[in-house]
Amino acid sequence: MPSIVGKRRGKHTYYYLVESARVDGKPRIVSQEYLGSAEEVMAKLAGASTVEPVRSQHKRFGDLAAVWSMLDRLGLVAIVDSVAPRRADAGASVGTYIALAAANRVVAPCSKLAFADWWATTAGSRWVKTPAGSLDHRRFWDAMDHLDTEALRQVETELGRRMVTEFGLDLSGLVLDMTNFATYIDSTNDRAPIAQRGKAKQKRMDLRLVGLALVVTRDGGVPVLSHAYPGDRPDVSQFAMVIDELVTRYRQVSESLESLTVVYDAGQNSHDNHAVVEETGLGFVGSLPPSDHPDLLAVPRTDYLPVDADRYPGLTCVDTTLTALGVTRRAVLTHSPTLHAAQSRGFDQTLAKARRRLAELQARLARGKTRRDRAAVEAAIAAILKPRWVGEVLTATLTGEDPTELRLTWRTDHNARKRLEDRLFGKRILFTNRTEWPAADVVAAYRSQSEVEAGFRQQKDPHVVSFGPMHHWTDQKIRVHVFYSVLALTVAHLMRRQAERAGLHMSVRELLTELAGIGETVLLYHDGGKGRPRARRMLTDTTPTQQRLADLFNIHRYAPTR
């Protein structure tokens, strides 16, 4: 039964509401809530307050508490600390620093230099106790120095196990893809060979790149394996290494590879890469460039059958076998009216742009004012006709030799346009060794690539769950940065998956925005005497959706008690 007890502090007595129970046969206080001084208790009973607050603060709470709850369920701090023991002079353990970095990546990405100021705006210091000065950016760097490549691999492997046991994650279907991220590392820095100039997918050709291979589950798009590599290396060159590591990891959590199916796109295709997949015995679903298989494309549309009218209205297919990449395997040629229409619209826009450029060049040559020789004009025409399929439909003829005599004529071959559309538009060739699957399941597996693509887009969002900003300039620290950035994506997608299963269908950003709306208000009181102001904390009002999320992620355990 609850009771009120007083505790003497100097000349003053402060009162608490306590509840006792027997623990191991002995009476113990199991809960305690501060009520205040005698005057404050009397004022509360009278429905008044002895003093008004002198000021207030607003702290970030909901999103950070939910993320920390997920990190706690994963056991991140303990896992990291098991491979990177804490130094005696460190303000916090290595695991704590990595958890703090990952949480920051999820809710409000910033540099380590700005971290302490950001942390002060949150309620996190109530449940993560760190000494003053321990959140300095140099302390983060010290912690990162304790995690080499092997330690990161061990941590990632153990986290994979925890995701299966704690969240029931289904690893039978995995999707592999690769991308790269631009960095702002100085060109003269020779301590980060992993950052190289290459084909930037963010179109920043002026910046050095870090490549990232990611394997995510079809069950929620949750990352289970990442691999950072130099940004100047083609994606296809990293495929075998990622598959080998994936097989090693999977065998640590499952006795057999027979249930595992890996999905990847045609960009990873090569005879050597496919030989690796065949040797491992993995199930796979990939794709082949349709234009490489004209005989299959020539199958008449009357031979196509519906894939699944309920799941994929309008989608039809031809289910056959095909020899490619050195093997003969099942091939599912699909035709999608939606893709067909989109490709047709896109190609019409490309054609219109090419026609406009040809007309401009034609008019310029007709005026006889060009100074370019014939070879230069031919190169300009070739550049205009270079986009995919344009050269099949537009025909350009250049006459004359002298620059002032050069003339251009061009025409659109509408019959060629029609043949092109009938042959290619709307078609995909899926390549798989899952012969027992219905065609609809093969299509579903291939389309699950959207999960990893969504993850890459999320990591390029500068506001939440972002890869950047990255202010590191050595290989080792870049790899640690990649690790906790991928971990942030893992946590965010686990949260989205958990919300989805609870009937809350929202994107990562929508989810975090709802949680961020749960704030903590701090009221500061001072009676005019000596000493620091007394703080009273409370959470802001919540909407029904916010309340459901608060319950779902159990953030109440981090809520203030007084």
Where are these regions (language model features)?
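Anion-binding and metal-coordination hotspots
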Residues: S3-G6, H12-Y16, D24-R28, V54, ...
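Accessory, often N-terminal, substrate/partner-engagement and coupling regions
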Residues: G47-S93
